[in-house]
Amino acid sequence: MNENLFASFITPTLMGLPIVLLIIMFPNLLFPSPTRLMNNRLVSFQQWLIQLVLKQMMAMHNPKGRTWSLMLISLIMFIGSTNLLGLLPHSFTPTTQLSMNLGMAIPLWAGAVITGFRHKTKASLAHFLPQGTPIPLIPMLIIIETISLFIQPMALAVRLTANITAGHLLMHLIGGATLVLTSISPPTAILTFIILVLLTMLEFAVALIQAYVFTLLVSLYLHDNT
């Protein structure tokens, strides 16, 4: 148990070179483009799931917002697949890195905000001052709304990082406790192993839910600006 608790969150290297780019590109292999007239069950299930998520996410958008459909579905597939790959033993989860999550959140948020200021300038500026605000509170509310606008990408990135990191740390701690208790108290080790299995199943759900939540919030920001 001399391994650092946060060792699994350190970017892996190969011959001194970071291999995070290979890890990030690996999910592309999980979603192959169909090359046959008749798809197999896996590809058919993937296409059905993608269409279902896309239909729910694009239902609230106007035609201008629906032009982002390819971007949003690619985002949810990328985050979901990287989260699931991170659950494999001795693997690395890129979404535990706040820098990477900020790299996804800031451009998407900025694109949505710029779209709003470009096509709906008056409506976008009206968000900074709610209707019916007393005159003495106008400067304070403008400052508060401006801060809340710029904190949105940080909230997106921190939420994803915290949820994925917390789950991985719990799995690491319970897994280590199971190994230690195997020689000390086998009945207790069996109990902790059952808890570890249940937690792993929960983490599979969290990996997909967090991908959906991240993409849904980006979609909501886009909806407010289109």
Curated annotation (Swiss-Prot):
Asked if the keyword S-adenosyl-L-methionine belongs to this entry, the reply reads no
Q: Which CDD domains match?
A: ATP-synt_Fo_a_6
Topology relative to the membrane: Multi-pass membrane protein
* Alphabetical UniProt keywords: ATP synthesis, CF(0), Hydrogen ion transport, Ion transport, Membrane, Mitochondrion, Mitochondrion inner membrane, Transmembrane, Transmembrane helix, Transport
* One Gene Ontology cellular component annotation held by this UniProt entry: proton-transporting ATP synthase complex
| UniProt superkingdom | Eukaryota
Any Pfam family matching the protein: ATP-synt_A
Per the UniProt entry, what are the Gene Ontology biological process annotations, in alphabetical order?
proton motive force-driven ATP synthesis; proton motive force-driven mitochondrial ATP synthesis; proton transmembrane transport
Instruction: List membrane-spanning regions.
Output: 6-26, 68-88, 97-117, 138-158, 164-184, 189-209
Record's keyword annotation contains Chaperone: no
Primary location recorded for the protein, binned into one broad class: mitochondrion
Q: Where found, per UniProt?
A: Mitochondrion inner membrane
Q: Which residues form a coiled coil?
A: none
GO molecular function per UniProt: proton channel activity; proton-transporting ATP synthase activity, rotational mechanism
User: What is this enzyme's catalytic activity, as reactions?
Assistant: H(+)(in) = H(+)(out)
Subunit (UniProt): Component of the ATP synthase complex composed at least of ATP5F1A/subunit alpha, ATP5F1B/subunit beta, ATP5MC1/subunit c (homooctomer), MT-ATP6/subunit a, MT-ATP8/subunit 8, ATP5ME/subunit e, ATP5MF/subunit f, ATP5MG/subunit g, ATP5MK/subunit k, ATP5MJ/subunit j, ATP5F1C/subunit gamma, ATP5F1D/subunit delta, ATP5F1E/subunit epsilon, ATP5PF/subunit F6, ATP5PB/subunit b, ATP5PD/subunit d, ATP5PO/subunit OSCP.
Q: Which family does it belong to?
A: Belongs to the ATPase A chain family.
Q: What does this protein do?
A: Subunit a, of the mitochondrial membrane ATP synthase complex (F(1)F(0) ATP synthase or Complex V) that produces ATP from ADP in the presence of a proton gradient across the membrane which is generated by electron transport complexes of the respiratory chain. ATP synthase complex consist of a soluble F(1) head domain - the catalytic core - and a membrane F(1) domain - the membrane proton channel. These two domains are linked by a central stalk rotating inside the F(1) region and a stationary peripheral stalk.
Protein name in the entry:
ATP synthase F(0) complex subunit a
Organism, scientific name: Ictidomys tridecemlineatus (Thirteen-lined ground squirrel)
Q: Which gene specifies this protein's sequence? A: MT-ATP6
